[in-house]
Structure formats: C-alpha cells, structure tokens
Amino acid sequence: MAGAKEIRSKIASIKSTQKITSAMEKVAVSKMRKAQMRMAASRPYAERIRQVIGHLANANPEYRHPFMIERPVKRAGYIVVSSDRGLCGGLNTNLFKALVKDMSANREQGVEIDLCVIGSKGATFFRIFGGNVVAAISHLGEEPSINDLIGSVKVMLDAYLDGRIDRLSVVSNKFINTMTQKPTVEQLVPLVATPDQDLKHHWDYLYEPDAKELLDGLMVRYVESQVYQAVVENNAAEQAARMIAMKNATDNAGDLIKELQLIYNKARQAAITQEISEIVGGAAAV
C-alpha cells in the first residue's frame, strides 16, 4: 500500500492548497468591490476634466500651453502602471506585451524611451528586460492616494516641459468588467483632440483671471487625474484577475482531487484483491 499512501498524502496536500486558493478568491472578491467603488467615485472627475481638455485641444485659446503644442518626437515617455503582487493571471504579462509592442514601434522610428514605473512587477520586469527608468514608485496599498503619485508624475512632466521628452503616455489595464481587463496605451501630452460628435466645432473660452494661470494649473491636474484613474482602475483589474485566477486554481484542485481519489480507490481495490487471492491460494495449498 506504499503507492496508496503516497496518493493519500498528495490528496491531503492538494486539499490544503485548495482551501488557501478558495480563501484568496473570497478576499479578492471583497477587495475588488471596494476597488470598483473607488473607481466609480473617481471616474466622473477624470472623465469631466478629460472632456474639458478635449474642448481646449479643439479650441483656439489665446495662450497655447506647452502641453497643447505638438513637436517632432525624438524621445517618448511612458508612465507604466503595474501591480505590486502576483497571482493575478496574465494581467501584468499582457500589459507588458502591449507596452513592448508600442515601444518597439517607436524605436523603429528612432525614438528613445524614458519610463516611469508604478508597481513592483513593473520594476522587476524592466530590471530584467532593460529600460531607462527615470522614476519609480511601488507599494501604494489598496487605497492609493493621488498625493503619492504627484512626485513621479512631476518628474515626467518636467521632462516634457524641459524638452527631454516629446510625448508622454500612460500604460495601464482598463477594467471592462469582472471577466475582462484590457491593456491600453493612452497619450497624455501633447493633448489629443477628442473625436466626439459634440466637439466637431471649436469651443471658445473666457479665462479668469488669465489663460496662462488657469491652463498651467489645469493641465497638471489633468495629467495627475488621468494617472490616478489609471492606478485605481488597474487595482480593480488586478483584484478581478486574481479572483478569476484563484477560482480557476480552486476548480482545478477539485478536479485533481477527484482524479487522485479514483486512482487511490483503484490502487486500494487492487491491493485488496491481491490479498484475497493470496489468502485463497494459501488455503488451497493447505
């Protein structure tokens, strides 16, 4: 029965792992709901300021902020939003694939790359893959604050204003629904005119106290809000991906336990049959 004992030990080990993955699934469900609430709370502001910025990009304001002026791209910057922890399926892998594809397209055109990395997984990836990381931040926790992001975002915005980079994009996972998370690369600056039907015409604004003072503050707030929204959505996507990954692990453990239980029963049945045969054979010899 040595084989049966080994199988029984494997079953016990898998059941123990199954309990852990089941508990992690339940925790991920709870965290995902909280992350969705934070995402829903911050989304109206992010979408509204994006709409206003879209109007400005289509308008002819009296003052053209540097973020509104396109120039030849010799160096591009990326703010990469990844997770701090693993066990979330292919969430980070798919994000890095989308980023590397976009970076490769830029490099083919002779464009150099600077990176601002948010999240431990992104930092680990670029240590292995290579890349010019000029700013990094991690361990933002379950409830990230925009104040934690301002320093890293400022590094990239200063680089743009100083002419060290000519385009800045944010790379993150969009939370579509519980089952779907989509890696996206979105240009932040220079501003991209919004193609909405409502913006087919030009918008004119009156600026108080003056256009320069207002736009200087508004543009920075716009970038900060978009990066913060990307972090919040990526957090929700991470918890959803982890929930699905842990559910799949729990289900797979259940299937494996059933298979091993069947093998164990067959081994036990074979051992009992052999013992009976030996007893019958011994009795016949007597």
From Swiss-Prot:
Entry keyword annotation includes Ion transport: yes
Main location: membrane
GO molecular function: ATP binding; proton-transporting ATP synthase activity, rotational mechanism
Localization per record: Cell inner membrane
Cited SUPFAM superfamilies: ATP synthase (F1-ATPase), gamma subunit
InterPro entries the UniProt entry points to: ATP_synth_F1_ATPase_gsu, ATP_synth_F1_gsu, ATP_synth_F1_gsu_CS
Function: Produces ATP from ADP in the presence of a proton gradient across the membrane. The gamma chain is believed to be important in regulating ATPase activity and the flow of protons through the CF(0) complex.
Name of the protein in its database record: ATP synthase gamma chain
Phylogenetic placement of the source organism: Bacteria, Pseudomonadati, Pseudomonadota, Gammaproteobacteria, Pseudomonadales
Recorded name of the encoding gene: atpG
